[in-house]
C-alpha cells in the first residue's frame, strides 16, 4: 500500500516548497540553482533531512526509539496516506455498509456518516451560487470558458477533458456534463490538500499543529487539530464535533479571533472538503498519540495497536449525533424573574459557581482563574489542554466565540468548552436553570432577548 521511499520524499519536499515559498522566491531559487557553481566554492552540502510527519511530542517521547519512530510513521502512512494525498483504510464493516470516507458524497458512499440527499442538495445549491459565472458561461454556450483555478489541479484536469470532448458529445450533453461538474463540485483529497495549503496552513500549519508562520502573532493561537479537541461544538463528551459544528465555524468564523468566515471565499463543496481535511488531521493525530501511549505503557508495536486505535477514534466521530444537545422546547422568555434566578445561580458557589472564574458580574477576573497583583497586573491561574493560559471570558463585552445565540450559550453551559477548564454543567443543572443562566449572561452582555 505504500509508495516508494524515493517518491514519497520527492513529493513531500515539493509540497512543503509550494506551501512555504512565494512565487518570486521560488523563481529566484530556480534561477540561482541553474547557475554554474564557481570552482572556488566548497562542495554543495548534502540535502536537509526529510521532515518527519510525526508530531514534535512524539519525536521527543521516542527520542531514543529510532526503530519505533520509523515503524510508527510507516504505520500511519499505511493507514492514512500522507499530507499530500491523504486516504483512509476502509474497514470491513464499512465496506459492508457501503461507507468509504475517501470518496465524494456524490458517489453515494457517505450516507453511513449521515450525509443524506438533503445535504447533497444543499451542497449543490451552494455550489451553484459559488460557480454562478461558470454556469452562466456554460448556459450561454460561450466560446471562451472560465478556468483554470489555483489549487484545483484535479478539477482543472477534468474541466479540460470535458471541454476537449465538447464537439464530440454535442451541445446538450456537454452542457449537462459541464453543469454537473460544478454543481457537484467536491474536491479530491489531493485538491483539498492544496486548498488547505493555500488557505489554512499560514495559521494552522501544514500538519494542523497550529504552528503556521502567522501563528506567533495571534492571540488566541490557532487550534492544534491533532488533539481531536474542538472547543465549540453541540455535543457532549466523548464525541467529536458534528459536521454542522465545523461547518458553522467555516461559515461564520470565531468572533474575537483571527478565524474569519470562508463563506464568500470558498464554494460549499470546497468548505465541505476542508471539513474532511480537518477531520483527517484530527483522527490521524489522535491515533498517533494513542500508538505512542501504547508503546510507552505496554511496548505494543504501532503495527499491532493501530487497528484498535483507528476503530475507536473513528467511532467517536461517527457517533457524534448520539451526543447531540438538541433544543427540546422553545426558548423560554428572558423575563426579569429568569434573569434574577440566573444571577443567583451565577454567584452561587454550590450550584452554578460561574463567578469563581468569570468574576462578580462576569468581568473575567474570578479568584479561581485570575490573580491580580497590588499594582493591577493580571496573571492567569488556569491552562487549557495545549498548555496555554486560559483566560475566562469577560462576559460584558458580548463577544462569544462559539456564537451568541441563546442555543449557542446554552450549549456552552451544558457541554462546557472542550479542552479548557470551563466544565460541562449538563449533569448538574436542570434545563430551566441553564436557560436562566443563559438569559443572565446575555443580559450583562447587552444582547437583546430572542
Predicted regions and their residues:
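C-terminal motif of bacterial Sec signal peptides marking the signal peptidase cleavage site
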Residues: 29-32
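Short sequence/structural segments immediately N-terminal
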Residues: 40-41, 52, 56-69, 73, ...
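Electrostatic cytochrome c docking/interface patches
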Residues: 60-195, 303-349
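Extracellular/periplasmic ectodomains of large secreted or surface enzymes and adhesion receptors
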Residues: 304-341, 362-396, 409, 448-450
Amino acid at each position: 500500500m505504500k509508495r516508494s521511499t524515493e517518491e514519497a520524499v520527492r513529493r513531500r519536499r515539493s509540497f512543503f516548497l509550494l506551501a512555504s515559498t512565494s512565487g518570486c522566491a521560488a523563481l529566484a531559487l530556480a534561477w540561482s540553482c541553474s547557475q554554474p557553481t564557481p570552482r572556488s566554492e566548497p562542495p554543495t552540502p548534502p540535502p536537509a533531512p526529510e521532515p518527519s510527519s510525526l508530531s514534535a511530542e512524539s519525536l521527543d517521547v521516542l527520542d531514543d526509539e529510532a526503530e519505533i519512530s520509523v515503524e510508527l510513521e510507516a504505520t500511519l502512512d499505511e493507514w492514512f496516506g500522507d499530507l499530500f494525498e491523504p486516504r483512509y483504510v476502509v474497514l470491513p464493516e464499512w465496506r459492508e455498509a457501503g461507507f468509504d470516507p475517501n470518496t465524494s458524497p456524490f458517489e453515494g458512499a457517505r450516507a453511513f456518516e449521515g450525509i443524506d440527499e438533503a445535504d447533497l442538495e444543499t451542497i449543490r445549491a451552494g455550489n451553484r451560487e459559488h460557480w454562478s459565472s461558470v454556469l452562466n458561461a456554460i448556459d450561454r454556450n460561450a466560446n471562451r470558458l472560465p478556468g483554470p483555478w489555483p489549487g484545483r489541479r484535479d478539477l482543472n484536469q477534468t474541466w479540460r477533458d470535458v471541454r476537449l470532448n465538447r464537439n464530440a458529445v454535442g451541445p446538450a450533453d456537454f452542457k449537462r456534463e459541464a453543469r454537473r461538474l460544478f454543481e457537484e463540485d467536491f474536491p479530491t483529497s489531493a485538491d483539498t490538500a492544496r486548498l488547505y495549503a493555500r488557505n489554512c496552513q499560514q495559521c494552522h500549519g501544514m500538519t494542523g499543529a497550529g504552528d503556521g508562520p502567522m501563528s506567533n502573532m495571534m492571540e488566541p493561537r490557532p487550534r492544534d487539530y491533532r488533539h481531536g479537541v474542538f472547543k465549540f461544538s453541540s455535543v457532549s463528551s466523548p464525541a467529536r464535533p458534528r459536521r454542522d459544528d465545523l461547518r458553522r465555524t467555516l461559515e461564520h468564523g470565531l468572533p474575537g479571533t483571527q478565524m474569519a468566515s470562508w463563506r464568500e471565499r470558498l464554494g460549499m463543496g470546497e468548505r465541505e472538503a476542508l471539513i474532511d481535511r480537518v477531520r483527517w488531521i484530527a483522527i490521524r493525530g489522535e491515533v498517533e498519540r494513542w500508538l505512542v501511549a501504547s508503546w510507552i505503557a505496554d511496548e505494543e508495536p504501532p503495527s499491532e495497536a493501530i487497528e484498535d486505535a483507528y476503530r475507536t477514534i473513528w467511532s467517536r466521530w461517527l457517533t457524534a449525533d448520539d451526543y447531540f444537545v438538541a433544543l427540546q422546547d422553545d426558548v423560554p422568555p428572558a423575563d426579569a424573574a429568569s434573569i434574577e434566578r440566573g444571577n443567583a445561580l451565577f454567584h452561587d458557589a454550590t450550584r452554578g459557581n460561574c463567578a469563581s472564574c468569570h468574576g462578580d458580574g462576569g468581568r473575567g477576573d474570578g479568584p479561581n482563574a485570575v490573580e491580580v497583583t497590588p499594582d493591577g497586573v493580571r496573571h492567569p491561574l488556569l491552562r487549557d489542554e495545549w498548555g496555554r493560559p486560559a483566560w475566562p471570558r469577560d462576559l460584558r463585552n458580548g463577544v462569544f466565540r462559539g456564537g451568541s445565540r441563546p442555543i449557542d450559550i446554552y450549549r456552552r453551559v451544558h457541554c462546557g468548552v472542550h479542552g479548557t477548564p470551563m466544565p460541562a454543567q449538563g449533569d448538574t443543572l436542570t434545563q430551566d436553570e441553564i436557560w436562566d443562566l443563559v438569559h443572565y449572561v446575555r443580559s450583562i452582555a447587552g444582547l437583546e432577548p430572542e
